[in-house]
């Protein structure tokens, strides 16, 4: 039988059952490769979309922070230094961040959401003077906080998607360049071995038939050399005689008891 050991294949015994099993595994590997390829395409599409949003938000973040800085300068100019008032009134953070998970083709992406916990504790700040500027200041910084949380979500999703895409691409390449070729090499080996087994079986049957035919010819030649079989001596005479009755008693053989 042919070896095929030089190829990278699965160690199996060549049989019809193994061939059917390898065909099933090949079909499953091809289907898995197709699904992973679609998953990688979907992740790449979402990855490019997130990258575009990150660039846009960073540009917008610069403008929002610049506007918030100008609002802070205006509020300090009109209302004076109110930082000590804010610090004294702080008991807990008003803005909090909660996280939820978003499923994208089997990959869980973290999504951060900013929300205000409780009423505004600084409603009376700037009541004497500069109230409008302080209100505008709070609005601008609230917008900056929301934008920062959104940017944090995008950057976290960017990193998570980058790792998921790398893992998916490694799996796709492993199936395409390792698993499927191994199964195909195994199928080729099994088919080659089965064909060789069939050829050997056919040759063996032909050899047996040839030996039987040769033996019959030798027996026929031997019978021809010996001629017809001879009949046994007296065989014809005994055949012409009627069968002897063993119960009948011949008179000559009777014993003489009395004279």
Curated annotation (Swiss-Prot):
Cellular component terms per the entry's GO annotation: proton-transporting V-type ATPase complex
Pfam hit, one:
ATP-synt_D
**Region (Disordered) location:** 214-259
Q: Which UniProt keyword terms apply here? A: Hydrogen ion transport, Ion transport, Transport
Q: Does the keyword Translocase apply?
A: no
Q: Specify the superkingdom.
A: Eukaryota
Its transmembrane ranges are none
Instruction: State whether keyword Ion transport applies.
Output: yes
Q: Which GO terms describe its molecular function?
A: proton-transporting ATPase activity, rotational mechanism
| Similarity annotation | Belongs to the V-ATPase D subunit family.
Whom does it interact with, and what assembly results? V-ATPase is a heteromultimeric enzyme made up of two complexes: the ATP-hydrolytic V1 complex and the proton translocation V0 complex. The V1 complex consists of three catalytic AB heterodimers that form a heterohexamer, three peripheral stalks each consisting of EG heterodimers, one central rotor including subunits D and F, and the regulatory subunits C and H.
Role summary:
Subunit of the V1 complex of vacuolar(H+)-ATPase (V-ATPase), a multisubunit enzyme composed of a peripheral complex (V1) that hydrolyzes ATP and a membrane integral complex (V0) that translocates protons. V-ATPase is responsible for acidifying and maintaining the pH of intracellular compartments and in some cell types, is targeted to the plasma membrane, where it is responsible for acidifying the extracellular environment.
Entry protein name: V-type proton ATPase subunit D
The source organism is: Caenorhabditis briggsae
């Amino acid at each position: 039988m042919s070896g095929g050991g030089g190829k990278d294949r699965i160690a199996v015994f060549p049989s019809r059952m193994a061939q059917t099993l390898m065909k099933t595994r090949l079909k499953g590997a091809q289907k898995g490769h197709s699904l992973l390829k679609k998953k990688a395409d979907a992740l790449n599409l979402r990855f490019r979309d997130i990258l575009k949003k990150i660039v846009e938000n960073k540009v917008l973040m610069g403008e929002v922070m610049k506007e918030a800085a100008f609002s802070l300068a205006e509020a300090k100019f009109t209302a004076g230094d109110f930082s000590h008032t804010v610090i004294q009134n702080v008991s807990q953070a008003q803005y909090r961040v909660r996280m939820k998970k978003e499923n994208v083709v089997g990959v869980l992406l973290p999504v951060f959401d900013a929300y205000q916990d409780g009423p505004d504790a600084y409603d009376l700040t700037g009541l004497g003077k500069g109230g409008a500027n302080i209100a505008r200041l709070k609005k601008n910084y609230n917008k900056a906080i929301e934008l920062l949380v959104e940017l944090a979500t995008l950057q976290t999703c960017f990193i998570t998607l980058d790792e998921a895409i790398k893992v998916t691409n490694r799996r796709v390449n492993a199936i395409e360049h390792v698993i499927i070729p191994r199964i195909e090499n195994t199928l080729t080996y099994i088919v080659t071995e089965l064909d060789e087994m069939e050829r050997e079986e056919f040759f063996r049957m032909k050899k047996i038939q040839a030996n039987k035919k040769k033996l019959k010819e030798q027996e026929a030649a031997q019978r021809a050399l010996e001629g017809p079989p001879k009949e046994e001596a007296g065989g014809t005479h005994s055949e012409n005689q009627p069968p002897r009755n063993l119960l009948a008693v011949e008179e000559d053989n009777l014993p003489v008891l009395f004279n």
